[in-house]
Regions:
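Rossmann-like adenosine-cofactor binding region
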Residues: 182-256
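Glycine-rich adenosine-cofactor-binding loop
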Residues: 118, 129-150, 164-168
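NAD(P)-binding Rossmann-fold cofactor-contacting core
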Residues: 152-176
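Active-site catalytic pocket residues across diverse enzymes, especially alpha/beta-hydrolases
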Residues: 149-153, 176, 215-216, 304
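N-terminal ligand-binding/catalytic initiation module
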Residues: 1-111, 119, 126-129, 262, ...
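A structural signal for isolated positions on well-ordered beta-strands in alpha/beta enzyme cores
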Residues: 134, 159-161, 185
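Adenosine-phosphate binding glycine-rich loop
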Residues: 10, 230, 234-323
Length: 338
């Protein structure tokens, strides 16, 4: 078993553009993957552990260039008072042999696949000529989203508006100083920002009520609430609601009142036109799929599989055919870095 840390993953220099390509590739596999619903337990109050399993399809059936069929399960946790409070790890298996191949720190994977999904969804659903993107919540997820947006379309110039919060907007702009295809404006009022946006991406992790008035969400806007918070008012008024998985949103309070719903993967596959008018208001809920996590993990594992410098752990298994313990070598690579 290989132990793969975040530091080692980052050292691979995986570009945001490649992350976008992996997201498109993984969405194309969704119909053939086994993707059970997430399971969560709650030790106390807002603390949680969430398990996210996924069996990728046999590569022979998809044309994806994997060396083997993979199963993986990501464990996400949030513990109040822990440092960091939010983290995730992923176990990757050979689906044919049951061998545990790797234990990975999956914080980088989670951030970048989330950003790539937002970028892909925004491009697929935005109106004709859209160029103004607005962001609220300017942490790592927002940065990953904009990195993927800019690098996936280097020929396109973007106007990006940021909601002011402490010094986060200024620091956010500094991160993108090297990019020539973007200009920034900092705004103080979220409704004013929304009115001027073609695409509104929210990366806040908590909200006690609606963030933006319905009147500020003008015809043609695309809203992507990355962490699902603050836009419940859109559920009954918007022309279309998209999601990464039906099971993720069918429990929403107003699901039965959606005017039109489908999965974003159907849009990416060309089975659904997505936006049919530049006047439509569209919201896309991407709750997060283990499909993406396991695809990223498999790609990373195959990039590192032959790297002898990575820490490996030998697993000792007891066989049913003998009373003695027999060594069954299980090369697992685990990379852990917070």
């Amino acid at each position: 078993m290989k132990i793969i840390s975040q530091q080692r993953i980052k050292s691979l220099g995986i570009s945001p553009k490649r992350c976008v390509e992996w997201i498109r590739e993984s969405f194309a596999m969704k119909a053939q993957a086994q993707l059970p619903a997430k399971i969560s337990v709650h030790p106390a109050d807002t603390d949680f552990f969430t398990s996210m399993p996924c069996l990728l399809p046999n590569p022979a059936d998809t044309g994806v260039n994997f060396h083997r069929q993979y199963f993986g399960v990501k464990e996400v946790h949030r513990i109040e008072g822990a440092v960091p409070s939010l983290g995730s790890d992923l176990m990757l298996y050979d689906a044919k042999s049951g061998e545990l191949l790797a234990l990975m720190d999956s914080d980088w994977i989670t951030t970048m696949r989330t950003g790539a999904v937002a970028a892909v969804s925004a491009k697929a659903l935005r109106k004709t000529g859209a160029e103004t993107y607005a962001f609220v919540g300017l942490g790592n997820t927002a940065r990953a989203s904009l990195l993927c947006i800019l690098e996936a379309e280097p020929e396109k110039h973007f106007k990006v508006k940021l909601l002011r919060y402490k010094k986060q907007a200024e620091l956010f702009i500094q991160r993108f100083e090297a990019y020539s295809n973007v200009e920034f404006e900092i705004m103080d009022n979220i409704d004013d920002m929304a009115k001027s946006a073609d695409v509104l991406i929210s990366c806040i992790t908590s909200a006690t009520g609606q963030l933006v008035s319905d009147e500020a969400l003008l015809p043609g806007i695309t809203v992507i609430p990355v962490h699902m918070r603050g836009f419940q008012n859109c559920d009954t008024t918007f022309d279309r609601v998209l999601g990464d998985d039906t099971d993720h949103v069918k429990g929403f309070k107003y699901f039965s009142q959606f005017k039109a719903f489908n999965e974003i993967g159907e849009v990416l596959a060309g089975n659904d036109p997505g936006r049919t008018s530049d006047q439509q208001r569209i919201i896309d809920y991407n709750y997060g799929l283990a499909l993406h996590d396991v695809t990223f993990a498999a790609k990373i594992f195959e990039m590192l599989e032959s790297d002898a410098s990575i820490q490996s752990v030998e697993m000792i298994k007891e066989t049913a055919n003998t009373s003695a313990f027999v060594t069954r070598a299980s090369c697992v690579t685990v990379v852990v870095l917070r």
